[in-house]
Amino acid sequence: MKIILLSGGSGQRLWPLSNGTQAKQFLRLLKSPEGEKESMVQRVVRQIKEAGLLESITVATSMSQADMIANQLGEYGVDIVTEPARRDTFPAIALASAYLQKEKHCRPDEIVVVMPCDPYTETGYFHTIAKMVKAVESNAADLVLMGITPTSPSSKFGYIVPQAGDASAEVQPVNRFVEKPERALAEQLLAEGALWNGGVFAFRLGYITQIFEKYVNAPSFTEVRARYQEFPKISFDYEVAERASSVAVVSFTGQWKDLGTWNALTEELPSQTIGNVVLDEQAVNTHVVNELDLPLICVGTRDLVIATSNDGILVADKDHSEDLKKHLAKLGTDSRPMYEERRWGKYKVIDHIEFADGQKVLTKRLCIRAGKNISYQVHHHREEVWTIINGTGQLVLNGEQRNVKPGDVIHIRREQFHAIRAITDLYII
């Protein structure tokens, strides 16, 4: 069995902590069994490891998130497949399946499980995946989905409606799918025994390759990736699940949450405050996450979520936190992330100014982890000035190599090739 983890998202749902490169699944806000901070994706992969399935993971993600995946999951040695462009879940799954077929040389009868990288769930979830695999092995259906037993007639999820029959059966044929219904219809669907669509699919590799080869039939994974734009921009549900002639569902009744809103996330945070925060005794149902170095004091607040980062500040009534996305549109699309993690380390933007003469100055604080490096590169339109503030490293500037230490200042002019490797953790402004 192979697992494809889908990692996407635009980073808007938990703004200002999340952004285009640091989507919600990468926020280290949860607590591991050892008491350490962990992200949603780290939690899921840890659970997969505990289920004995670690060696089978391939993460399908965008190029902008690849470094974050490598940083957070590097210790697990997962494979990473990057989309050349974002084109929804069907192309992403097709590309990852092509990787399994053409790079990992998996057989057509290899069973593949596709799942999101960020469900907040428990061990029984992975036992249900095992049941899905068993259903595919026994040819109960070509495509098997996980259905989450609903806790309310929610309009936030799609629904899977099983065929009439034995509702207690472990595997049920699917009658139809309903996409995010209004509450009245959702209540009717619950009466019919409908399940939330958990976005988890199981199938044989040959099943999906026959489908994606209708669009891109190429001898190598490299060519499939090069022709990625030929895949339709459509979800896996629409392109495959809803058109499947042989589809079944296995239900899961344990803990399952989508931590995609501030209201949902705060219910699972290990404490009411994270960061430099003072919350007075009169504060009621208030959660504060402060990523800034500045102190934040809350007095007499009620039913609020407050979050601060270098990207902005959010103060929201918890019941209205789901409305965040429509307000973000007012900020425009030209804002850049103020914090990013890369394969070599991380950086934070600490100042950005444009002078009257048009000159722009961007100031960053970089941390390059010991043994990592920024690759040999050249800039055609800007100059850089590096000040080493802590640690030691090896600099290559226009082919000349030298060691650098705290206090060294390096002026990198246009058209000069440069690279730097950290001997110890290296901090640069």
Residue ranges and their predicted role:
Residues 419, 423-429:
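Double-stranded beta-helix
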Residues 41, 96, 118, 160, ...:
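Residue-level signal for inorganic ion chemistry
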Residues 203-387, 392-410, 416-418:
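Left-handed beta-helix
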Residues 2-5, 15-20, 30-116, 120-126, ...:
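Conserved N-terminal catalytic core of the sugar/cofactor nucleotidyltransferase
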Residues 5-7, 60, 113-116, 145-149, ...:
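Short beta-strand segments
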Residues 122-228, 248:
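Conserved core of the sugar-phosphate nucleotidyltransferase
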